[in-house]
Amino acid sequence: MPRYLGLMSGTSLDGMDIVLIEQGDRTTLLASHYLPMPAGLREDILALCVPGPDEIARAAEVEQRWVALAAQGVRELLLQQQMSPDEVRAIGSHGQTIRHEPARHFTVQIGNPALLAELTGIDVVADFRRRDVAAGGQGAPLVPAFHQALFGDDDTSRAVLNIGGFSNVSLLSPGKPVRGFDCGPGNVLMDAWIHHQRGEHFDRDGAWAASGQVNHALLASLLADEFFAARGPKSTGRERFNLPWLQEHLARHPALPAADIQATLLELSARSISESLLDAQPDCEEVLVCGGGAFNTALMKRLAMLMPEARVASTDEYGIPPAWMEGMAFAWLAHRFLERLPGNCPDVTGALGPRTLGALYPA
């Protein structure tokens, strides 16, 4: 059976996930590898997410470094598995999103797939999102089709919740097309706030948030953003939810303890997820969580409290480690492309119809 590699570097910018799958009737995870994002590269990518000078040259330089990291990760995983490049049919590379503005009909991921193919000796399938945008879609989320393939074959009303920098949900109802949308900020604001206040990259187990108290006036102000009231299809990114956005809201309120702000940001993530999910799928019986948020103990407990009628659990219970779900999805999307099969869900993204996503860069 063919083997594929998937590369994922998400909006949290903590590092790069490299996964190896085998694709038959089912998708099987064979191996995984992780490379932390170098601090300088992370900061330079973040700087590209907002308007600035000399963007074209800076983006070209940054993506050379991003590709070098990706190629290193591929080589290390293959070495660990004692495999050669010709044993891999293709790499599915998401690239690194630096702008996502579907309302303006564009999304931009850097990642120079031609150079990645050259450095690894493996065919690369990349540029998945723009095909959906070209068909009138949001270009995100793209993982619901993969979630459907993994978890949509029984009679359970189920949601698969990915909590990365942003949160998105796939709604799997028996006998119905898969639906899904972005819920809002996942970890992105909590990560930004703890880094701003304490120099840490994330709130381990949600412990700092758990030490504070939710400020309901601030929470109401944050939830008043029009994104939360919008119905799907919808997607979002750092262009909308970022540290300056939070600071604008904080300026309208009396000074608050930093831990209380973190607690309020965790509640924002939990509420935006639970309210949008239950509004769209009130009969949901099970919520399977993947992404970095699955490791945030405080957030998982809060989600379970807000959705008492549904069982909230990690995808680990089904043999899919939550950290590797998105990497697996883009390996699977590479397979879909090479077989000329659709990879999007029109009811999720709003595209005019099913489309084969991606473009091929031969080695």
Curated annotation (Swiss-Prot):
Mutant lacking the gene: phenotype: Cells lacking this gene accumulate anhMurNAc. Deletion of this gene increases fosfomycin sensitivity. Growth rate is not affected.
Residues at which ATP binds: G10, T11, S12, L13, D14, G15, M16, D17
Molecular function via GO: ATP binding; kinase activity; phosphotransferase activity, alcohol group as acceptor
EC number: 2.7.1.170
Keyword Nucleotide-binding attached: yes
Pathway: Amino-sugar metabolism; 1,6-anhydro-N-acetylmuramate degradation; Cell wall biogenesis; peptidoglycan recycling
Record carries keyword Electron transport: no
Top-rank lineage group of the source organism: Bacteria
Entry similarity comment: Belongs to the anhydro-N-acetylmuramic acid kinase family.
Primary role: Catalyzes the specific phosphorylation of 1,6-anhydro-N-acetylmuramic acid (anhMurNAc) with the simultaneous cleavage of the 1,6-anhydro ring, generating MurNAc-6-P. Is required for the utilization of anhMurNAc either imported from the medium or derived from its own cell wall murein, and thus plays a role in cell wall recycling. Contributes to intrinsic fosfomycin resistance in P.aeruginosa.
Name of the protein in its database record: Anhydro-N-acetylmuramic acid kinase
Species the sequence originates in: Pseudomonas aeruginosa (strain ATCC 15692 / DSM 22644 / CIP 104116 / JCM 14847 / LMG 12228 / 1C / PRS 101 / PAO1)
